[in-house]
UniProtKB/Swiss-Prot annotation:
GO terms for molecular function: RNA polymerase I cis-regulatory region sequence-specific DNA binding; RNA polymerase I general transcription initiation factor activity. It comes from the Eukaryota. One of its GO terms (cellular component) is nucleolus. This is RNA polymerase I-specific transcription initiation factor RRN10. Component of the UAF (upstream activation factor) complex which interacts with the upstream element of the RNA polymerase I promoter and forms a stable preinitiation complex. Together with SPT15/TBP UAF seems to stimulate basal transcription to a fully activated level. It is found in: Nucleus, Nucleolus. Its main location: nucleus. GO terms for biological process: nucleolar large rRNA transcription by RNA polymerase I; positive regulation of transcription by RNA polymerase I. The gene is RRN10. Keywords: Nucleus, Transcription, Transcription regulation. InterPro entries: Rrn10, Rrn10_Saccharomycetes. Component of the UAF (upstream activation factor) complex which consists of UAF30, RRN5, RRN9, RRN10, and histones H3 and H4.
Length: 145
């Protein structure tokens, strides 16, 4: 069976019927382990995050909190409705980047409250949300991106 990264991301591939194969394992197998792919445990990632946070490199989480599978499915379906030739075009890096970008936009939007003429009003904050916006009713036009 020709296993691919997209099946691994969907937890479809099981090895020996006991455990789910990760996308990194499938990718390493595809390139005959020519380039070693580093595997970090959750504890190692948390330690690196804490070190970077203490040094002031960034704030927040290095891995997005939102469910990336939902984001991946939604983004894939949205793109495939308009661009069917892009099937299987997303990889793990793009998913993590998309998740981080969505969290940043939501944070920008939710934390921006300005006071105008003595009353508070919610407005889109300065940053990427201000420049990248398009009103779309996705129920009527899900492929309009």
């Amino acid at each position: 069976m020709d296993r691919n990264v997209y099946e691994a991301c969907s937890n479809i591939i099981k090895e020996f019927g006991t455990h789910v194969v990760s996308a990194d394992e499938v990718l390493a197998e595809k390139i005959d382990n020519a380039v070693p792919i580093p595997f970090k445990t959750r504890e190692e990632i948390d330690a690196d995050v804490e070190k970077d946070r203490n040094e002031g490199v960034f704030e927040g989480n290095i891995i997005p909190d939102i469910d990336l599978r939902v984001v991946h499915y939604y983004a894939t379906q949205l793109c495939l409705n308009k661009y069917p030739h892009l099937i299987n075009a997303f990889d793990e890096t793009s998913l993590i980047t998309l998740g981080l970008l969505i969290e940043k936009w939501v944070k920008d939007y939710l934390t921006s409250i300005q006071t105008e003429q003595g009353r508070q009003s919610k407005v889109i904050g300065k940053g990427p949300c201000e420049f990248i916006s398009k009103h779309i009713d996705y129920r009527h036009a899900p492929g309009n991106i």
